[in-house]
Amino acid sequence: MANDQNRREAEALTALARALAASRPDMEPTLREIEGLAAAALGRPAPIEVERGFEQAARRLRTGWLRSVAAETARVLRSPTEREIERLAHSRHDAYGYERDFQPESLEARCEAFFGPAPPGWTAAHVMFSSGQAALATVLLHLGERRRGKLEVAHVGSYFETRELVARACAPARNATDADCIIVEPMACDGRFTRHDPARLARRLTRGQVLVVDETLSAPATQAPAILAEAVAGGAAVLRLVSGLKLLQQGLELANVGIVSVFATEADLAASLADGLKRCRTLTGAGLRFVDALALEAPFFLDREATETYAGRVFAHNAALAQAVMARNRRFKPLGGAGLAGAAMPYCAFELEAGNGVEGLEALACRIEDEATARGLLIERGGSFGFRGHRFEVIEPETGEPPFLRIALGARDDHSCSGLIELMGRLAQGGAEMRPRWRPAGGGLHPE
């Protein structure tokens, strides 16, 4: 079984390399290197060494692609000459007069095939930004343009940067009914996962209101069809927001990107919102840079089948982790409410039932490191989620919420994935005292 799983990862990496080499001929040397690294990894005796070989191959693939992209973009100034603009116009890339006004029309056109057409009676437009948060900030800027006072926003979710952005730029609405804009996270996490129902909010929209649905934690799956099936009032709009860095790039993190899909039953409203977002994008520099757009020309980005397969493995592995922990749990608080049954989560978040502080969580993190080393499991300290390999970190929110341990299992179905699931199930039972390699000193945590 393990050999089959390793062969699948080797084949996946070489398939990605072949796709990139087909797109850029100067990637041929990288393709040959990846083929060699993948084959060498398969020949290593220890499972952890096999996985390290795959990690090396993935990093080399990313490096080769970004080096190729950088070599091309280095030949074009950020304010190109007329001759350079003409040359770009005759290439497969989007031309631009100055980079802050770069319009990634080719990538935005690919969004319709990826996300699918708008339902009957709806018009859709897709706008890309330099990140998910840049996208949201631009949305709030544009929506507030014609308001006499501050834009009134209701935030139904947990993401701390969204909360801070709304607090800095907008006025909090007393409730969703009174809000100019409602931001909802269908899957939210602040140490515990919570589900929210955007369709219920859509039913209550009135003319002039905008519902922003942040699906970053659940992409590429979407609730848009269910939301748009509601009797949304004319003159209201629904915007879907996705950060494309996490689960849409096969774990390679080629470039930050945020995607806003604008839906309205009135074609003029959809066009006006999309055009306004694009203009604000130029004014604030919130758009993609030319080098980012070329990096995102990777054929697997916005490939529906490839993305669903990849993200599906991430969700499945973290679901298995959650189930293993909860089945034997005597150490952690519940991961979330009963409404989470069957929910897809791209990582797991754990709070200790007793003594949930940074010191206790750090002690647990050190125990995980020790046990992983003893068992030959590959997991690294680091943030975010959606990688090919596995990560974990202790998070202490700046906003005052309780700290928590995040474990983000990746897409690789490897020895470490199954081993970490088994390890966390055992640790969830409690029992043996965890002696930290860290001790409090001078108000902080310091190594022994």
Model-predicted regions and their roles:
Residues 100, 128, 155, 185, ...:
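Glycine- and other small-residue-rich loops at beta-strand/loop junctions that grip anionic moieties
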Residues 171-231, 237, 243-247:
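Active-site phosphate-binding strand-loop segment of PLP-dependent enzymes
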Residues 137, 141, 194-202, 414-429:
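Amphipathic, non-transmembrane alpha-helical secondary structure
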Residues 154-158, 184-188, 214-217, 351-353, ...:
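Structural motif
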